[in-house]
Amino acid sequence: MKNLSILLLSAFLFLLPLKFASAEKVHGIAMHGTPKYSNNFTHLDYVNPNAPKGGTVKFGSYGSFDNLNRVAFKGSKAAGLGYVNDTLMRRVWDEAFSLYGLIAEKVELPEDRSSITFYLNSNATFHDGSPITRDDVLFSLETFQTKGTPNQKKTYGKVIKTELLGNDGIKMIFENNEDKELPLIIAGFLPIIPKKFYEDLDVTKTFLDIPLGSGPYQVDSLDPGRQIKYKRVEDYWAKDLPVNKGLYNFDTIIYDYYKDSNVLVEAFKVGEYDFRREYNVKRWLSEYDFKAVQNGEVILTEMNNDRPVGMNGLVMNTRRCLLYTSPSPRDIPLSRMPSSA
C-alpha cells in the first residue's frame, strides 16, 4: 500500500508541470489578467459598428519621405504604412495592453510565457486575394530578426525556435521567459509581409514601389516626399471581425508633407488638412484663436494624457562646468577652475 501511495504521488508530481505548462486556445491575451472582451464580443465599446463609410481625411506631416519598404532601416518611411500590413493580433485602446485575434484567429500563451502559438485565420488574405500562410509569418519573423531595425533585431531575436503545428499553427519558442511583454509585442507589432513580394528584393534598401499588403488600406498614389494617398480596401478580408467593426471608415487618407514646421501650422489654419495634434504649450496658448476657430469650423479639444511621457529638457554635451551654485565662479581661484580637457 505504501509503495502504491509513493507511485501515485510520483505520477502527480510528474504531471504537475505539464498542467501548468499547457495552455488553451483563446481569442485574446492581456499583459495583466484577462482581456476585457469575451470570445463572443461583436464590436469594441468605443466605436459605432454602423458608422457610415466614405469621404476623405487629410493629415499634415513634417519633413519628407523616400521609402515604402517596411523592413529597411534606411530612409524615411511614409506616414500611414501601418494601414497596409496587418499583424497577427490587434491592440485595442480601452485596455492597457490587450490584443485580439486578427491574422491569428486563436492563440495559446502558457502561464510562464516561454512561448506563444498562433493559429491562423483561414480567411486571411493579401490584397491580391492570395492566402496569408505560415510561410509568410516565418518569413516576416526571420526578415525582421536579421534585417530590421536594431530594436527589431533585438526583440524578435529572442525567438530561438519555431514549430509548425497541425494545419494552421505556428509556435514560437523564446530564449527564456524573462521578457513578459515579448509574446504581446510579437502578436501586435510584427508586420506580416508577403514572402512572394519581398523574397527577391534587397529588403535593406529603400523603394517606392507600391507594396502588396493585407490591411484595411493600400497605397493609391504618391508624389515622393510631398504626398501619399491611401484608398480603403473594399473587400478587406477582416472588415467584419469584431475587432475591426466600426473602424477604417474613410475611403481615402492623404498625408501632405511640409518641410517647415511653421508652414505646417499655417496650412492647418487655412484648412489645408483636417486634424492636428499640438504639443507646443506656447503655441497652443497663443496661436489657436484664428478665424476658423472663431467661426466654429475648427474645434479645439484638450485631452488628459494619463500615460507616462518622456523627459523634455536641454542636455549639454560639454566637459566644462556650466554653473556653480556656491561659491560664485568669480570667487574661485583660477587654479581650481575646471580644465577644458
Where are the model-predicted features located?
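Aromatic- and charge-enriched surface segment that lines or borders ligand/interaction sites
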Residues: 47, 52, 72-78, 106-150, ...
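Gly/Pro-rich hinge or "lid" segments in bacterial periplasmic/extracellular proteins
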Residues: 64, 84-95, 142, 187-254, ...
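Bacterial N-terminal signal peptides
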Residues: 8-16
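Extracellular/periplasmic solute-recognition and catalytic clefts
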Residues: 161-164, 220-231, 256-320
